[in-house]
Swiss-Prot record:
InterPro entries: ATPase_NBD (IPR043129), Heat_shock_70_CS (IPR018181), HSP70_peptide-bd_sf (IPR029047), Hsp_70_fam (IPR013126), HSPA14_NBD (IPR042049). It comes from Homo sapiens. This is Heat shock 70 kDa protein 14. Component of ribosome-associated complex (RAC), a heterodimer composed of Hsp70/DnaK-type chaperone HSPA14 and Hsp40/DnaJ-type chaperone DNAJC2. Component of the ribosome-associated complex (RAC), a complex involved in folding or maintaining nascent polypeptides in a folding-competent state. In the RAC complex, binds to the nascent polypeptide chain, while DNAJC2 stimulates its ATPase activity. GO terms for molecular function: ATP binding; ATP hydrolysis activity; ATP-dependent protein folding chaperone; heat shock protein binding; protein folding chaperone. GO terms for biological process: 'de novo' cotranslational protein folding; chaperone cofactor-dependent protein refolding; protein refolding. Belongs to the heat shock protein 70 family.
Length: 509
């Protein structure tokens, strides 16, 4: 049997397969190993990938990008609000759910984000089937460490809707370590690994402890203000200023011209990871005027120096948060396409001069390869070199129960603080007046790192038809068990009568 690993990022998606004892990325039908996570809608078809991205200049209002940023979120979510404000494809709330409004001229339809993600997963499945055949559908999906329960559920549902059998969701930094077999080279030793992931829209950092082949997340941090798109935008703004200098026209207010410059800047950025200079030529950029500009790597590095500095300061901040110094880190794993940038790699080497920088696997392929290896482990491949590796995932957010204090005000009790090693089990006793016949246990999550954190309800358990008591309180015992994949099982039992209700919030099948 064979297995599949899929990484759906904000700007791109990548699929790897495990077969015959090896894991590797599969190229799509265009010959590319990474597929743009873009879906375009036309009158008669849905286009996924590079063709959708290339057509966005002509069809921007019906082209969905960065769907991962809105998956499983509500209109009240600050990140969803930011996404809605920036999206060129109209996002509205319909029947309490966020929907893309697609107008192809013939009809207007409303598409939910999960369906967009389903199309991308279908493209990944089609790509995997090109080498494995149509019977291989077992998959491990990667998720960011800071994804909440609703985001994980939405991602899993989209993958299942595409026809995948989801074995597990795995956190991205754990997948990165699996790809390099970290923990197997010195299975009895203890080491600290920094996973540096610079993706299309964000910078994610994780410090992982590897001890006797066991992985544990010590700390993690994500900055949504640093990503590959920010480097591209910086270069695009420079190109716009060069056009203005040469032709006395400011095109920064022209959306079509700026999209052309952004596309050219993205190509140049990729070229500058291997070349000393890149040429940006645009035919008829503005009012019939062609634009030809050569950008050196040195110029690119100078323009982006504030972004490089932010990346390094983010690393220092995460180390300080753990009381670590650079000497406490044994290896650095590079992930995400933008971590290919030579200047950034050099700055990381300067910060960790005695540390091995792992980049032999293409950074945008590391995470899906790790997911494919995990899938191979789960379906019982006996000849995997990392078959004995064991990961301990951690809860990414605080998990809380809601109660009331003596004044009647809401009070939250944290049962699983962020960073709790999984699996884990907690008990909580909820007291309720004996005069009521139903009791509700409400579950919330919050970002424990945020001083202005907000609790978000994600589930509840209701005990109904309880016998009323004239006096006193009733005790309800809640037992919460969180599995390694982050799924949660909750039982609530009336201690006096034994009446019980249970729910499971499943993350992977």
């Amino acid at each position: 049997m064979a297995a599949i690993g899929v990484h759906l990022g904000c700007t791109s998606a990548c699929v790897a397969v495990y077969k015959d004892g090896r894991a590797g990325v599969v190229a799509n039908d265009a010959g590319d190993r990474v597929t743009p996570a873009v879906v375009a809608y036309s009158e008669n078809e849905e286009i996924v990938g590079l063709a959708a991205k290339q057509s966005r200049i002509r069809n921007i209002s019906n082209t969905v990008m960065k769907v991962k940023q809105i998956l499983g979120r509500s209109s009240s979510d600050p990140q969803a609000q930011k996404y809605i404000a920036e999206s060129k494809c109209l996002v509205i709330e319909k029947n309490g759910k966020l929907r893309y409004e697609i107008d192809t001229g013939e009809e207007t339809k409303f598409v939910n984000p999960e369906d967009v993600a389903r199309l991308i997963f279908s493209k990944m499945k089609e790509t995997a089937h090109s080498v494995l055949g149509s019977d291989a559908n077992d998959v491990v999906i990667t998720v960011p460490f800071d994804f909440g329960e609703k985001q994980k559920n939405a991602l899993g549902e989209a993958a299942r809707a595409a026809g995948f059998n989801v074995l597990r969701l795995i956190h991205e930094p754990s997948a990165a370590l699996l790809a390099y077999g970290i923990g197997q080279d010195s299975p009895t030793g203890k080491s600290n690994i920094l996973v540096f992931k610079l993706g299309g829209t964000s910078l994610s950092l994780s410090v992982m402890e590897v001890n006797s082949g066991i992985y544990r997340v010590l700390s993690t941090n994500t900055d949504d203000n640093i990503g590959g798109a920010h480097f591209t935008e910086t270069l695009a703004q420079y190109l716009a200023s060069e056009f203005q200098r040469s032709f006395k026209h400011d095109v920064r207010g022209n959306a079509r011209a700026m999209m052309k410059l952004t596309n050219s800047a993205e190509v140049a950025k990729h070229s500058l990871s291997t070349l000393g200079s890149a040429n940006c030529f645009l035919d008829s950029l503005y009012e019939g005027q062609d634009f030809d500009c050569n950008v050196s790597r040195a110029r690119f590095e100078l323009l982006c120096s504030p972004l490089f500095n932010k990346c390094i300061e983010a690393i220092r901040g995460l180390l300080d948060q753990n009381g670590f110094t650079a000497d406490d880190i044994n290896k650095v794993v590079l992930c995400g396409g933008s971590s290919r940038i030579p200047k950034l790699q050099q700055l990381i080497k300067d910060l960790f001069p005695a540390v091995e920088l792992l980049n032999s696997i293409p950074p945008d392929e590391v995470i899906p390869i790790g997911a494919a290896i995990e899938a191979g482990i789960l379906i019982g491949k006996e000849n995997l070199l990392v078959e004995d590796s064991l990961m301990i995932e951690c809860s990414a957010r605080d998990i809380l129960v809601k109660g009331v204090d003596e004044s009647g005000a809401s009070r939250f009790t944290v049962l699983f603080p962020s960073g709790t090693p999984l699996p884990a089990r907690r008990q909580h006793t909820l007291q309720a007046p004996g005069s009521i016949s139903s009791v509700c246990l409400e579950l919330y999550e919050s970002d424990g790192k945020n001083s202005a954190k907000e609790e978000t309800k994600f589930a509840q358990v209701v005990l109904q038809d309880l016998d009323k008591k004239e006096n006193g309180l009733r005790d309800i015992l809640a037992v919460l068990t969180m599995k390694r994949d982050g799924s949660l099982h909750v039982t609530c039992t009336d201690q006096e009568t034994g009446k019980c209700e249970a729910i499971s919030i499943e993350i992977a099948s």
